[in-house]
Amino acid sequence: MILELIERLFSRSGKNSGEDARRRLKLVIANDRSGLSPEMMEEMRREIVEVVSRYVEIDPGEMEFSLESDQRMTALIANLPVRRVRRTKAKSEAQES
């Protein structure tokens, strides 16, 4: 997750550099306002994926997590593409023990 974020932040794309800089600045501000360390963000991402995976099969290669912030609040945006809905709830590793 962190490596994907860094690649997205610093990758060269067809967009102009002003748009890239604005997007990076928004992400930095949102991270700062949230008070979440990169380690906490990664742990939260892992737990969200674990819980959602009990009910649906998700495409891990296409997942996106981001923080968006305005003057009033910070929002965690999770985009988890669903491959299929599970017929029964999958057991988590904690439940299997």
From Swiss-Prot:
InterPro entries: MinE, MinE_sf. It comes from the Bacteria. It holds the Pfam family MinE. The keyword Cell division applies. One of its GO terms (cellular component) is plasma membrane. Keywords: Cell cycle, Cell division. One of its GO terms (biological process) is division septum site selection. HAMAP family: MinE. Belongs to the MinE family. Prevents the cell division inhibition by proteins MinC and MinD at internal division sites while permitting inhibition at polar sites. This ensures cell division at the proper site by restricting the formation of a division septum at the midpoint of the long axis of the cell. This is Putative cell division topological specificity factor. It comes from Synechocystis sp. (strain ATCC 27184 / PCC 6803 / Kazusa). The gene is minE.
